[in-house]
Each structure stands twice: as C-alpha cells, then as structure tokens.
Amino acid sequence: MTSPQAVEFLDEFEVIVVGAGHAGCEAALASARMGCSTLLLTLNLDKIAWQPCNPAVGAPAKSQLTHEVDALGGEIGKMADRTYLQKRLLNHSRGPAVWALRAQTDKREYAAVMKTIVENQGNLTVREGMVTDLVLGDNDEVVGVQTYFGVAFRCQAVILTTGTFLGGRIWVGDKSMPAGRAGEFAAEGLTETLNQLGFETGRLKTGTPARVDKRSADFSVMEPQPPDQQVRWFSFDPAVWIEREQMNCYITRTTPETHQLIQDNLHLSPVYGGWVDAKGPRYCPSIEDKIVRFADKASHQIFIEPEGRDIPELYIQGFSTGLPEALQLRMLRSLPGLEHCAMLRPAYAVEYDYLPATQCYPTLMTKRIEGLFCAGQINGTTGYEEAAAQGIVAGINAARRVNQQEMLIFPRAESYIGTLIDDLCTKDLREPYRMLTGRSEYRLLLRSDNADQRLTPLGREVGLIDDRRWHLFTRKQATITAEKERLHATRLKERDPAAQAIVQTTGEKIKGSITLSDLLRRPKFHYCDLQQHGLGIETLERSERESVEIEIKYAGYIQRQQRQIEQVSRQEQRKLPENIDYASIETLSMEAREKLAKVRPLTVGQASRIGGVNPSDINALLFYLETLARLSPVS
C-alpha cells in the first residue's frame, strides 16, 4: 500500500471499479447512474463483459438473481434479452418457486452491446489499466489506486471485481502460464498488497471446455434441444422485449471410449497429477471429476451450444477439462456427432486468488479498509449472475458511502441477492459458491415473477429506476391487486352456463357457488381456463396473469413455509444424536451429507452454520429427527 504523499494523482473520481466483467459493469453503471463520477479500469477494453465460459444467462436460482438485478435497475437481464440465441423455461412442470429462465446468448454481441452501454453512460469513464496498489489515508481508508505503470487516481471508494485475473494461471495438462483466461495476462501485484494489509487470500480453480467448429459436427445423430416457442423475458422493461430468430442446441453423450481415455490418463490432469490443489466448483465439475466421482454412471449428457449467430464455434457444455490438448481431441471425437470434429480452442483449467468474503460486511465493504469493496469471483463465487448481483450491491453502497448515506444490507428473507451475500459473509466457504434454489429457505416468497414487487421500490429509492420504469411498475402492481380483488369477490353459481362448462371440462363439481379465486386454487385449473370460459380479463399481460394465479394458488404453501422458518428458529438448540448416519438420509443434498459427516455438529443450530448446508437441508434433518422420535420405543 502507498501513502497519498508518495504519489501524484493523474485524475480524481468518486468511485473506481477495478475490472470490467459482469460484476464490474453492474457496479460501475450503478455508481454512475446514482450520480458519482466513476472510473472503470480494465485490462482489455475489447473484452468488457466477456463471457469466457458458457455464453448463457439464467438457469435455476441464477435466473432469480438476474430478475432481481433488473428489478433494482441493473443491466444483465436486459443484456440477455437483447442478445439471446435461444430461451427456455426450465422446471416448468414443477412449482413456480423453481421456474428458471435460461438464455443462450451471442458471446460477441453481448460484449459489444455492453461496451457501448458503459462507454456512453454519463459520469462513467472507461480506460485500460492494471491496478497493483491501493493508496490509503491516515485512518487506513482508501483514497486512491495505483497501476502497474505507476499512474495513480484519487477516489473515495474502490470496488475490486477482478474475476479470475488475480494471480491467474491457466493449465493444460502439466503446462501452465500466467493468465486470467486464455490470451489475456494475469493481474499481478494486487494480491501482495492485500496480504500486506492483513487480508487472508486463497486459491480457487475453475475451467472451461474446448470449442469446436460447428461445420465439422454431425447434428443428425444428436438430440435437438429446441427453444421455447413462447419467448419469456428477464427484464421487467418492455423496451428490450424484441423477439429474435432462435437457434437449436443439441445433446450428445459420453461413451465407454470417452471414459476409458480419461481413466487411463487421469495422471496427466493438473488436479489428479498433483500440480494444482485449488478447489474447483462442486456444481460444475470437470469431465474427469465426473468420471471419478460418479464411476457407476455409464454415460454423461453433453450439451452442444452455439456461441453466436455468425461465428462457427460450439461450446461443449459439461466437458471442461485440464487434460493435455492432444488427448482432448481424442476425447471429443469419442462423442457421437463429433467423430470428425475440428477443435478450435483447447479446454483449460484456471486457478486464481480470492478473498474469503467473511472479511466483508454484508454491504460488501471490507472490514479492514474503509471504502474498499469486493464483488464477484474475488469473493469466492462462480457465475456471471452471482457476479452481477454482487456488483450492483457494491456499486449502490459505494455510491451511498460517497454521498454520506447509510449503506444497504439486503436481508436473506427478501431476495436471492440477500441470501447470496449472507452466505458469503457468514459461512466459511472454501470452494467456489454457486447460487442454488435450495440455499434459500424463502424460495416460495422469492420467485422470479415478484422480483419487481420486492425490489423495484428499493431501486427507485436509491435512484436506479427512472420515471418511465416506475410508472410501468406501479401500473402493473395496481392491475394485479385489482384483479385479485375481482377474483376474490366474483362468485360463480353452479347453474351458470360457465360453471357447468367448467364441471364438464374438469370433472370437479361446484356445490352451490364458488369464487373465481377458489377455482384458481384447484391444482389443474389455471387463469387461461378462466379466459376460456369468459371469466378472465383478456387485456392482462402474461406476467400479470401468472402473478395473480401464483399468489392465489400458492397462498397456503407460502404460509406453511413461513411456519417452517419459525420452527427452524425454535429448533436451533436441539441436540443431534452422536451416532447419526448422515449418508443414509437421502433427503439431504450430497454436499450436506459430506459436510455434516465431517464436522459432526452437536446441535441443529451448529449444523445450520456449516458452509454448504442449506436451510432446506436443515428442514430435511428436522423431519428425520421427528421420524426417529416417532419410531423410537417409548421409555
């Protein structure tokens, strides 16, 4: 670290963001839109908001984060809506708490559009530079940054969003080089500065699969994965709802030849060869990890996904590896449909430095240095959506600190963003953290459809929701409220023609009369059925219809979940049997079984604070204890 007397500042900003990935862009845009002069520093102006791994946004829990960032006034949801190649709603056959929108995006278009947005944002300056040092004031508060080439910038707040670049090193087999990702140099020096300031740092690992030329693939032997015909949107802003031509993805599978190749050459992998001991992401394992951890599985699904409309590269999802390049081609050619493929880019593993986020407050400001914030992979997370969520929070709080306003803490009961940050700041997590629906005990309350209802008023309060968006929001909420009231108040008599038609269609009787809201509570009856019988409002938007139906149909489940939450709170001091066999409790996640068996907590409360043990696991554990109590002989 450097004192302000030892440097000459080239320029002055209120907030400086270090790194222009998905966390950095959200942080910089939030800060600038809230009126702070902001500098966004990046190692490469041509790789702003680059998607170095899978060019996709959304999926379970990640889509909820994306909707929430948009509801606050962020950009990632709009970006996915502007640049999608394919959209699909996952888990639609299940309850709305786990519905998950996923978009395959055009990698180059995504980066180009975001570059235009940040370059044209008022109050925001974008330039290249590698930050290696922090400039601190007399009270150990941040007052500036210094770059590798000795240029210094004064500021009141710094947000570190360094991704995989901090001490980054990529591996292919036993060959390695310093790099944040292929073709881009690593950020050196900043880790040493942070260590000198007393921060604990660690190493994590991730990886990306090879890219294949689509002209060399035989799609006729693969299973097509078509898009949904009815397009859905991440953003609550209709201004970005522009339908585009969609593309297919495809599915192939590993073969016995694939598995044999990997098993015979495990010793050549950076991890199994012993050259890398950093922890990788549990929920996005390399193909060699899958073969080892799931040795009983004869085959694994592999998804073949386009990286863009006008580029020939295919992303081979589920096939990341650190094995040698020559072996990678043999592995790829063992997959049906890729027997004659041309590999354009090899897969690689990347290890990098991170700061365990227990060193941050829930505002994402560090505890050691006033005015220093961290967001994204530097906090130990994995995924663009997790990064974007932290980025907008750090940007909001950095701006509020500059403006001498109270910084915000997002309660876990009110958003997935709050759940994410609470987990990061309170649990000692030593592997890359991915958001899962099971990590939230409030997931029935924290649905994608009501993200605007939960967070847009806050976005308006902090200055990220403009008058147009606010008008759209208030009109939508008024429409939903009015329609719910109409459905509760309107009764249908059993002799009405519409009632008789409904009985004939559904096979369920109507005795005397029934409210339209009670009709909607029936499991197989939906708002579209009301419309079919002339009982709905045709002018309602799909999002309004779905919100009305969900809030009426699942009201009882929501109340039950709230009671479960209260039960967990009461059960904190409940003792756990010393001889409990966690491996046999199938309702626990695999991660929870492993962590509980290793730590062997004494109480339910202690179990709930183990990293990787989610609230849903605690509910499963309580249910198991109740079952044990019922089956035990009465003494």
UniProtKB/Swiss-Prot annotation:
Keywords, sorted A to Z: Cytoplasm, FAD, Flavoprotein, NAD, tRNA processing
MF term (GO), any: flavin adenine dinucleotide binding
Binding site for NAD(+): 280-294
Residues that hold FAD according to the record: 19-24
Pfam families found in the cross-reference section: GIDA, GIDA_C_1st, SAM_GIDA_C
Cysteines joined through disulfide linkages: none
Compartment(s) of residence: Cytoplasm
Database matches in Gene3D superfamilies: FAD/NAD(P)-binding domain, GidA associated domain, C-terminal subdomain, tRNA uridine 5-carboxymethylaminomethyl modification enzyme MnmG/GidA
GO biological process, one term: tRNA wobble uridine modification
Keyword Repeat: no
Cofactor(s) needed: FAD
Gene Ontology annotations for the cellular component aspect, listed alphabetically: cytoplasm
Chain ranges passing through the membrane: none
Description of how the protein assembles with itself and partners: Homodimer. Heterotetramer of two MnmE and two MnmG subunits.
HAMAP family for the chain: MnmG_GidA
Family the UniProt entry places it in: Belongs to the MnmG family.
Function: NAD-binding protein involved in the addition of a carboxymethylaminomethyl (cmnm) group at the wobble position (U34) of certain tRNAs, forming tRNA-cmnm(5)s(2)U34.
Protein name, as recorded: tRNA uridine 5-carboxymethylaminomethyl modification enzyme MnmG
Record organism: Acaryochloris marina (strain MBIC 11017)
